[in-house]
């Protein structure tokens, strides 16, 4: 611990003035396969019974400019993993870092119904998200359920991965989920084009890498 002195305060002020001169390019880091692999390896060690995954996604949504809160244990009316909102969009969030993405697609429907019944959020105003560690493959049935929800209920469920949220955060992206730009279903399994359009550049992640932007090959 350093003692506060006039000289040290002066030195701090000088440093802050120099920092303020640094050009801010709204870009923290460049994504690549190696960094993502390291991050995914670390996350795979999370205890599945802990709330660490939910808190991580909550913090990333906050970094993107949204208010976000995870559910409280014992609250029977908020069994959803999280809810988010800002002036443009709001909705339920299902978070699935395991293999049970099919359950997440069904769970998000319960979340939408709960928010309408108990909290008055009309389903048409609920821009629901499913955030997974990796995009599920076609055989798991998740994307077919998402397509059915869209066709039958006219409800678009957007799908994002941990990696996609990290890329958006690293680029200080301004995301309006109400645009439904990250909608993917059985006929279009990728959000790569949507992410590249949003950032106006190519994404430096190999196709299929860790299921970040599309299912693994």
Task: Go through the PLM ranges and name each one.
Residues 1-51, 216-217:
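Interdomain/boundary linker segments immediately adjacent to catalytic/signaling cores
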């Amino acid at each position: 611990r350093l003692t506060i002195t006039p000289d040290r305060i002066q030195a701090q002020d000088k440093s802050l003035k120099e920092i303020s001169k640094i050009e801010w390019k709204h870009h923290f880091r460049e994504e690549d396969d190696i960094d993502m692999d390291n991050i995914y390896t670390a996350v795979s060690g999370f205890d599945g019974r802990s709330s660490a995954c939910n808190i991580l996604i909550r913090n990333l949504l906050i970094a993107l400019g949204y208010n976000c809160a995870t559910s409280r244990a014992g609250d029977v009316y908020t069994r959803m993993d999280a809810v988010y909102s800002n002036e443009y969009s709001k909705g339920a969030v299902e978070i699935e870092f395991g293999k049970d993405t099919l359950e997440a697609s069904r769970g998000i429907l319960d979340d939408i119904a709960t928010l309408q019944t108990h909290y008055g959020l009309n389903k048409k105003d609920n821009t629901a998200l499913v955030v997974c560690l990796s995009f599920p493959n076609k055989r798991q049935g998740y994307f077919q359920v998402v397509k059915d929800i869209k066709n039958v209920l006219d409800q678009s469920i957007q799908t994002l991965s941990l990696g996609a949220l990290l890329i958006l955060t690293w680029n200080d992206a301004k995301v309006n989920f109400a645009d439904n730009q990250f909608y993917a279903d059985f006929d279009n399994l990728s959000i790569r084009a949507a992410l590249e359009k949003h950032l106006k550049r190519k994404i430096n992640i190999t196709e299929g890498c860790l299921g970040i932007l599309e299912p693994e090959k």
